């Protein structure tokens, strides 16, 4: 499996899933929760004619929010799943909120649509800092995926009983569709580094995978333009990147999404068929579920293979060591007849009176 696979869900992918959920499952009744893995929770919601399962993972290697098929019943006895299951019993999910390019998702629950909000589930999808929070109507933390002590963070302490506060404010620029090419170029040219990091360090919502997508869809002279220092990139190539940059912003803002794959193991939710010559007849949420299901299983297999290889290597070394010990003992024992004769002679010598 190549580096960067499975692809980390960026804000564009998150936004595409939330757009689907907002359109298709609100309002809906909470039904149950289970925790199949330490860093993953699965939630079930029931509508008038359908049942929807969601999976949220705060695993640092692959944080994600997905609509999934009905899973096996695993992890119903975990403390977190019990707290959520009992706390949200008979409640309805009435809103899903996520602001602009922020990676914080808020699920709001009430006894019925129109009532005051009684509980919240907050999902923070921020790489190794990802987390889940279960809050009351005063934003007091009832349960949390992973606790953060004051010694671990200078910004906020995360523990049950404390009041929830969001992550630090993102001070980078917000991408704007009406920004001019010159303004965009001036903004990313302040520090002369690779185009990839110029974009990541300047604008909100830019991930390494987005820079790769812009590179793939842009007709530039250099096929690896994102790794090139911005001072050495021609104006024509920058304008080509900027053209697709504005397309991305437009589709992000207008929730215009479609799933496609590129470079074998990577995906995009804002490319269209005419841009990459790709036909996909499966809907976006199903495609995302299939992608992560396949690649996460492959990753587990690879980790298991490496574990088995380590065990075999260790056992082989032990066997070689034991073989050497036995061989040494055998070599020494080849003269045992001589030693036996000498000792016999000594034992049979007549003793002096």
Feature names for model-found ranges:
Residues 1-347:
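Extended, highly charged segments
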Residues 348-353:
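A short, hydrophobic C-terminal helix/tail in secreted or cell-surface proteins
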């Amino acid at each position: 499996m190549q580096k960067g696979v499975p692809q980390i869900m960026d804000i564009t992918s998150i936004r595409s899933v939330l757009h689907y959920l907002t359109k298709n499952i609100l309002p809906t009744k909470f039904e149950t929760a289970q925790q199949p893995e330490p860093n993953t929770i699965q939630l079930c919601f029931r509508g008038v004619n359908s049942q929807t399962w969601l999976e949220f993972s705060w695993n640092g290697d692959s944080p994600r929010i997905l609509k999934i098929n009905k899973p096996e019943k695993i992890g119903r006895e975990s403390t977190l799943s019990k707290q959520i299951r009992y706390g949200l019993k008979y409640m309805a999910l009435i809103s899903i909120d996520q602001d602009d390019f922020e990676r914080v998702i808020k699920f709001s629950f009430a006894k019925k649509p129109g009532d005051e909000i009684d509980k919240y589930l907050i999902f923070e999808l921020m790489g190794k800092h990802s987390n889940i929070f279960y809050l009351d109507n005063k934003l007091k933390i009832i349960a949390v995926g992973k606790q953060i002590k004051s010694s671990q963070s200078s910004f906020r302490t995360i523990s049950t009983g404390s009041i929830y506060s969001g992550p630090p404010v993102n001070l980078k620029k917000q991408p704007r569709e009406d920004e001019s090419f010159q303004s965009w170029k001036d903004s990313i040219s302040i520090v002369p580094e690779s185009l990839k990091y110029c974009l990541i360090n300047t604008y909100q919502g830019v991930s390494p995978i987005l820079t790769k997508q812009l590179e793939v869809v842009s007709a530039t002279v250099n096929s690896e333009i994102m790794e090139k220092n911005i001072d050495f990139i021609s104006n024509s190539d920058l304008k080509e990147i900027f053209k697709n940059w504005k397309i991305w912003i437009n589709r992000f803002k207008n929730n215009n999404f479609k799933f496609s794959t590129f470079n074998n193991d990577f995906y995009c939710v804002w490319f269209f068929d005419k841009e990459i010559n790709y036909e996909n007849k499966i809907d976006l949420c199903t495609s995302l579920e299939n992608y992560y299901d396949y690649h996460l299983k492959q990753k587990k297999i690879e980790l298991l293979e490496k574990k088995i290889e380590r065990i075999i290597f260790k056992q082989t070394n032990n066997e070689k060591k034991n073989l050497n010990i036995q061989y040494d003992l055998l070599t020494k024992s080849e003269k045992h007849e001589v030693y036996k004769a000498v000792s016999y002679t000594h034992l049979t010598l007549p003793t002096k009176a």
